[in-house]
Amino acid sequence: MTILEQMLEDTKSVAILGHIRPDGDCLGSTLGLYNYLRLNYPDIRAAVYLEESSPKFSYLKGYDTIRHQVDGECYELCVCLDSGDIQRLGDFKHYLDQADKSLCLDHHVTNTRYGGTNVVPDEASSTCEVLFDQLDEGKLDRYTAECLYTGIIHDTGVFKFSCTSAHTMEIAGKLMGKGIDFGAIIDNSFYRKTYIQNQILGRALLESITFFDGRCIFSAIRQSEMEFYGVDGKDMDGIIDQLRLTEGVEVAIFLYETGPQEFKVSMRSQYLVDVSRIAAFFGGGGHV
């Protein structure tokens, strides 16, 4: 019996949380757990609490049930997924504070082990990989598999990032065996962009600069530019990864303005630099 299964025993209600600005792994893991509970623990009252996210993930079952505001509900167990620290839970940390027990499932090397119980194997490719190992494979349906596969492809860059392991590929194969349309999931959630998203991506690439003999690349988008194109933070998805693919680049840095002189910073590296340590120094964290 896994740690998650032990904590679900005799539990009557579960709040499922992820991090602010939810991405593919966050949505995949939270909705994956939600669908698994609905199928295998029908007597448990469960709800997912997340900020608004990109509609490109609307194919995930349960997407339309996500709650975007703190309400008056109370839960016995709080499960936090893909969030390295309490602050990244945003306003929804309220449910962690009031729960009788809590579990943190994550894979980020910067995780602060803030849960009552923590499962954080930082060698895992994604939180969806961590979650898969906590579930009963035989009790997964296609909808849960779609969620988990979505998270894995997003945090592995469709299996090309260094975090991808043989175990990752083994899990992906098992999820494919559940009958998911893996090609459509990859195209619709990872590659396909709107015309406006392609425009802002092009702007970010056009305005980028390199330094340190071309080993670092930097780009930034101002709020005025975002207003001109009619985009928000959700439309910035994928820009940092495209910058990282520039030939000769080891570190990519991308900023977009969220308020007067306030910026959301994303960093990605190839192999030599651990950018998660830089992020942690400034109170952030995440992938290498």
Report the location of each language-model feature.
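A generic local secondary-structure boundary/capping motif
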Residues: 68-69, 91-94, 118-121, 138-139, ...
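Active-site cofactor/cluster-binding pocket
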Residues: 61-117
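Glycine-rich, phosphate-binding/catalytic loops in enzymes
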Residues: 33-34, 95-98, 120-121, 170
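Short glycine/serine/threonine-rich phosphate/pyrophosphate-binding segments
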Residues: 24-30, 86-90
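Solvent-exposed alpha-helices and their adjacent loops that cap or buttress functional pockets
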Residues: 71-72, 94-97, 111-112, 140-141, ...
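Hydrophobic helix-and-loop "lid/oligomerization" segment in the mid-to-C-terminal part
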Residues: 2-20, 28-58, 68, 72-77, ...
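Short alpha-helices
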Residues: 105-171
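Short glycine-rich anion-binding loops that position phosphate/pyrophosphate groups of nucleotides
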Residues: 20-22, 83-86, 108-110, 223-224, ...
